[in-house]
Amino acid sequence: MVEGFRQRYWPSGAIPVDVEFIVDVKLGLDIVAVPHLYRAYGIDGFLAADRSAVYIDHAVQEHSILYRYRFTLAHELAHLHLHGALFDNASFDSVEEWRDFLRAMPEESRSWYEWQGYAFAGLLLVPRDALTQKIEEAVERAHEAGFTDLDLGVEAHRDILAEWVGRRFDVSGEVVVRRGAYDGHWDR
């Protein structure tokens, strides 16, 4: 499902995936900065009820928190692509109403939708084959630099490698750690 989405909206396959271009140009959604969204509500962003815009915390968008910004956009794209039917009968015009909309859902459903959003975002921004290639490149570079006892089962080694790989995808090392575990490159 993610691969089909990426091929449709990012057919070049170039890394990093320009998720802002997909949201703004390919899908024509507005990206609206909201001051203090995270501080007031504990969220980085949300999709408008009419699916015309992604609202995102001003600090995330404007203050160079690039990785969070990109991941938040990808996460909201997941809700648009996977959970569009949820919004068919949704009616919220404020963050408070959006929060009430979410709270009205059973906790198990809400958790499942959020998990799907995180998984979709990670797969969109860090494609499986490209991740494998970048991990192999990182291991090779480490060996060439004399770090021959690199062990991705050691958390510190894995985390350093994940930070390096993450920079290639414009995502955090944490995203790479999760994606790498999901794809079997190391234990969870």
What are these regions (language model features)?
Residues 1-188:
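Active-site hotspot residues in diverse enzymes, especially metal/ion-binding acidic/histidine motifs
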